[in-house]
Each structure stands twice: as structure tokens, then as C-alpha cells.
Amino acid sequence: MGSDLPTLPASPDRLLRVRKLAKRYVRGGVWGKRVPVIAVDGVDLEIAGGQTLALVGESGSGKSTVARCVARLEKPDSGQIWIGEKDVGDLSSSSRLPLRSAVQMVFQDPVTSMNPRFTAVEVVEEPLLIQGLDRERRRKVALESIDEVGLLRAWADRSVMQFSGGQRQRLAIARALMLRPKLLVLDEAITGLDLSAQAQIANLLQALQTSHSLTYLLISHDLALVTRMADAIAVMAGGRIVETGPTSQMMMAPKEQETIRLLASARAAQSRLGALTEASA
């Protein structure tokens, strides 16, 4: 990973390319002994511009670590992350500013990334502070983004804590769009919402993908959401990608045992949820 951003062979149809990505942590063990943990071990993946890749796997498989490395919230130990033709895997803090514009992340719980003392418009306009825009211009652009995600401008000066979970996720998406990114990393961004809100946010993300030519890296364990949104699926286990392919192929004819087991487990969980929902109706 070079800090001088080497120009690589053109790949106009691939917005994100990850090669041999590795990340390790050191955690406390028995008797205070430090134990190395391999979170990501030589991951390769790529996403064509305007497409959605779903990265799936059990808890602890390494998928969220990959997401955080792509967004540069974590520094990889080795490997390359290319956005377009640039290797951005080892950027310094000062060189990372352009990447923040190109790649934005939307988390599962938006409250953790929002100042509870801020109003909705202040939360959304926050990324523009680093751009040096004046307050009037920031507010204008933020209000336009609030409109675009389906919230009312009349609510712009309410505290973010007055919004529901689904509405706060809309605000998080509006904020992510402020720097006109090319790639959105969606880390369980719809998990935890009720079914109605999940469907609405999924519809919104698909509409925004079309209108803004966005590319998505979708981290999810929700089989229905993955089937609906993803063009391709990559399955992780033990820090590695064990299988990848088009969504229809992966759902209908998975080849690896880990994929077969994961899909069977997800389908069983959905069947139980459906039965509980029907019983409580």
C-alpha cells in the first residue's frame, strides 16, 4: 500500500477493488496475556460502478472489519484498496480528505454518530464544515438533502432525538450524500428497524442508487434484503471470502458448504419470524 497513490491500470467498470486485505487485532486473554486475532485474512473483492455487493457471514466472520477498512475507519495491516485507479489503502490523515468525499459509511445505529444536541439540519450539514461553505449555503444544501430522503423541511430544526429510528436513518443517509460520494458502505444499515421501516429505507436506497449512480457495499445478514438489493454476494467465514457470485446463482445453487449452511440458517430464521408474526397478528 503506497502513500504516493500509484496510478494503476484503468478499470472503468470497477469502482472498488480490494486485494489481499488483512487486518489483525491484539486482545487480552487469560492471565492478561495478549492474544492476536486475525479478523481479515487476504480478502479480495470488487464492485462494478452502480452495482451492489452484499458481504454476508456470521457474526465475527470479518465482514464489518472489511467495511471499516474500505471506509478507512480502520487501517489495514496489508493489502490494497483501490477506488477507481487509486490505491487508497495507506493514506495519511491529511491525504484522506478526498477519500471521505468518495466513500461514506452508514451505520446500523445512526444515533452513535450523531451529536444529540444537534438539530436535524445541523447533523446533515456537518460534513460540509470541512469544505468551508458558509452557513447559509450549508443549510440550503442540507435542506435539499433532507427533502431527497423523504423528510419534511419543517422538521429541520427539531432535535435529532425527536425522530424515530427510521427517520434518523434517513438523516444519516442524507448526511452521507452531502459530499456526493461514489461508494456507500452500508453496515447493517437497516437492521433493528421494524419491517415497514426496513422496506421504506430499502426503497429509498434503491432510488438514490439510480438517481446518484451510487455503488453499494452492503453488510447484512438479512437474506430478504440481500436478495432484493444485491447484484452479487460474497460470503465470509473466518476472515476469508469462501464464495462469491451473482445473487441468483448464490441463492439457487451455492457451491461451498459454508454458503449452503449460512443460507439454510437464514431461511430457517426467516421462517420462524414469519410464524411468530402470523401468530401474533
Predicted regions, residues:
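Helix-to-loop junction immediately C-terminal to a conserved catalytic motif
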Residues: A71
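Conserved catalytic motifs of ABC-family nucleotide-binding domains
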Residues: R180
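Conserved ABC ATPase "signature" region
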Residues: D87, R137-A154, L263-A264
